[in-house]
Amino acid sequence: MFNKVVKEFQWGQHKVRLETGEVARQASGAVIVDVEDTVVLATVVGAKSAKPGQDFFPLTVDYLEKTYSAGKIPGGFFRREGRPSEHETLTSRLIDRPLRPLFPEGFYNEVQVVIHVLSVNPEIPADIPALIGASAALAVSGLPFNGPVGAARVAYIDNAYVLNPTRDQIKASSLDLVVAGTERAVLMVESEADQLSEDVMLGAVVFGHEQMQIAIDAIHELVRDGGKPEWDWQPAPKNEALIARVTELAQNDLLAAYQLRDKQARSAKLKEVYAATSAKLEEDALAAGTVAADKATVGNILFDIEAKIVRSQILNGEPRIDGRDTRTVRPIEIRTGVLPRTHGSALFTRGETQALVVATLGTKGDEQIIDALEGEYRERFMLHYNMPPFATGETGRVGSPKRREIGHGRLAKRALVKCLPSADEFGYSIRVVSEITESNGSSSMASVCGGCLALMDAGVPMKAHVAGIAMGLILEGNKFAVLTDILGDEDHLGDMDFKVAGTEQGVTALQMDIKIQGITKEIMQVALAQAKEGRMHILGKMTSAVSGANTQLSEFAPRMITIKINPEKIRDVIGKGGSVIRALTEETGTTIDISDDGVVTIASTSSDGMAEAKKRIEQITAEIEVGQVYEGTVLKLLDFGAIVNLLPGKDGLLHISEIVNERVKDINDYLKEGQQVKVKVIQTDEKGRVRLSAKALLNEAAAAAQSDTPPQQ
């Protein structure tokens, strides 16, 4: 019934099992990957034909985590998984990026890759098994795919690279890098680092590429024994006559368009060329009595002509689209404190790319609580990236963030997080929001620069300035050119897009997407060195504008004080059902967080409110001591004495015999409910009962007065 094929191999410190032929047999391809009890099912379905008029490759990748994989039941009313989490979205992008370039040009059939996480070992992240599974599923499916792809995670611990580290090892590492590629080439890198050198980063990429070969070999074996027949797909033959005619009609005008340095003017000119070319082809068809070529086909030909123009100009040493040489960074303008009532803000402009970045400080209660498969944890630092359509002069949908925005936000967060002060040094939670107001390439790196400046404006004591730069590459045969600070058009027309962020000391984030095979270690070395040169230039501009973090927080930012209480007293501060702490926060206008070890953090924009909250918490948690004198309030009168409140929640008995020295016939002659009375604690017992005395203070006062009286002559 089943044609089950299994391949097993040892990969670093883990044993890996690939399996196909038993589960999801109606999919084009399906593979189960098991890495030390982290199990994923990767499936691929490809449409047998492209939709009419399709002019792009419709690939979708969905990585889905099932809560049952960790032995949990989902929260919420419906008790089932809902919209994808940020982690699922980021992992979907991570898998998509190395797979997409390996489908052949002209293949427009819809392809859907779905990965289900079925079982989770908390120590083994599921993203690498998912990427290996997706690659293997595509390989066994028979779809036209120039894979397989391998992947590896690399850590850097004690000056040594570690392959596919556990979660505990990742926490101890100064590097978390994921690399994916084929047998011959690296295709994708995603990383976060603690100010490491370019040599260490490149070494990690090379190490990961070498170590992934065993996974690629295992996929080849799986295909050999359990793969489906290869699809009989051939790209549509090129219409050489149409290509020649479009080139004749448009090439000179496209050349003229790329002499325009302004993006808006250039875009307008390109639209004119596209429209005029289509109109002329329709006239040709009408005159010949034939059907004109569809606009998608014409558009693809025009795009190819554009690419040839731009690429040849750069490789021949001519100026780039905006007139720069290959190493020059666009003009930079920096302004901080641009918004009056925010905690920190910066406007970072680089050429036609601009980011308005805002930093907000909060308390521990503002931290993001994430319920992940491996367990719940809190995020103290959040960074959100938004790019509305007006940033590129277009109209479009405005709403929840798209995958691209989530990915760019995470990259900027990775770049900054290692340079933040620790929670012990700076107890605030931090949210940074980057609003892209103009975009022409490298908006995520503008978010890094603007984010660092906004944090410093907010008074966050950053370890160092952090800057980011986007680089490009054009490669033809043995000739190549590395481009510093790429434009949007150069990104689309180039062969590699990689972004490097870091400080003067080293790299904090590296993201690389390579669209072709054949990029060597030497080319990457040149690219990283040129990126460092550009980063240092930007850091110089940033340091000149803002030398360091503000020493004063914004008047609108919360202030914090911390006190330590006995952990056994936490329940007294919280009260039944939270009644005490709720009343405290409402009456003092503060936010109060209490950790399990008894550290109380009080935050407010009002210093008076913080002082009052601190005083009341100290009163609630204070211990009644024998011999101490208190100013108490009479709560209740009894026949034999009075109940006096000394501290919040702490009362004592003032016996009728301890009010005054003479005999008291009627307690009402001496005390009234609500009266303030000074009393001394004379006894406590093991049950917590407290006995008070007022006459003891009277006797002490009388004795003191007598000792001050001069002797009789």
From Swiss-Prot:
Name the InterPro entries for this protein: ExoRNase_PH_dom1, ExoRNase_PH_dom2, ExoRNase_PH_dom2_sf, KH_dom, KH_dom_type_1, KH_dom_type_1_sf, NA-bd_OB-fold, PNPase
Domain S1 motif, by residue range, is 627-695
User: For Mg(2+), which residues are the binding ones?
Assistant: 491, 497
The keyword Cell cycle appears for this protein = no
Q: Which PROSITE patterns does the record associate with it?
A: KH_TYPE_1, S1
EC? 2.7.7.8
In Swiss-Prot or TrEMBL terms, this protein is called: Polyribonucleotide nucleotidyltransferase
